[in-house]
């Protein structure tokens, strides 16, 4: 039986808890060659999660590995390419994986639950809210939810593609404070330390848009995610106000050290007299001081946006797959920024075939004074500024674009709304003016580098 990692003297119960999401890839918990679960890592993850719970925090684990464990259970050497075989192995492996998690957590008397999601569960607003409410209720009950994509039901066209993206959505859904993306690297560097002895680790990334992610950096033979997907996940999570951390998966105990350090650092840097009522990170660390906390191991943290996009607006931006594009002029964009709806007069063109209440991209383009050689009243390619749920489908918007709202009924024979999209159904991307982060590189265990 594992030793109880809880230390009553360090318990922070009674303080406002933080919500910590830990994402584990297949390569972190399943041996790439033998396909055996790496029990030593699983055990350390369990001890880390329970330690966080004893510190008063709430924990969610997003765990891959079902297919990898299924390969071992059925003595299959290589990951198959056919979807039906992958789905079958996922069904087999998920049972075994959850059995392992439950057995390990049971030693420390920590209840867990299983949540399996597909992209369709996220794109449907009612199911999204149901999943959100279930997760929040489980956290209130002191349960650790273990989340995975439902690979048995998901098909290629609607898969998340990797659990990095899923973990970011879960973190946003739960209003988490931290998302830990566990990987085979310690952190980001300002240059490749293998070729530049003066390379320095990057502790904080403020402007994630300045990072050039090498999406060609593939995952392991068992997994689907590489470094590019982690940068995408960090972008999603930080936009929802979640501090995102990349750190080494083989040392999960680092999570506790990093959380405690960041808690103490936040408290230390808070101006005297600041109200802690609005800052759970400060409230949860009343008993910590910066001097008393061990300096954390190497990691890179991506800072959250100061004005996060949450709940319905996050769901519109990141939970839905867009079915088309609406090209708008600068005046329409200014109106949207000013909290007005999207009027047809500001619509220049439409692309794609979408229906009423489906999601579309909003792209700002330059309006021409007269049609160009291509017959268009605009020139692009333009800049995507957000997403919207539309009140009219493609055929209707093509007919009413450029017209005043009072003309809609005359043109269509009816007028469901004066707006192409109501303002509450528009979610705009935020453009942050933040310090530029230098070109970053990630170094993996084998010594290779990945430009980020």
Feature locations, PLM:
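C-terminal catalytic "cap/lid" subdomain
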Residues: 2-452
